[in-house]
Amino acid sequence: MIDFSRVKNYYIRCGYTDMRKQIDGLVAPVQLEYRQEMNEESLFLFCGRRSDRIKALYWDGTGHVLLYKRLSEKRFQWPRNREELKLLTQQEFRWLMEGLSIEQTKAFKPGKPGSVC
């Protein structure tokens, strides 16, 4: 059984990923390039050139789980500007899954409390 309630870290690999890759081909860059270990608290997302499909890689404690989502219409708003592993907040992850950009320019940004006097 997949328990995503344990996921605390949502990572996306920015740029393009060859979507022909399966589990071993996706685990390799996570561990070798980015020095990240697979665990039950992390979900890794990959997107190809067409931006209409993503793969999610997850470790459930006994083995790797590979999830695949293909949109029937529209495209994911995927950051293409650099090859890196980006950590998302839960809100950014929801935005991405809802078809929005993770870099919302109109969303309220966290601020610091001001003085009252």
Question: Language-model segments: which ranges?
Answer:
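Polybasic/polar functional segments that serve as interface/processing modules
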Residues: 1-117
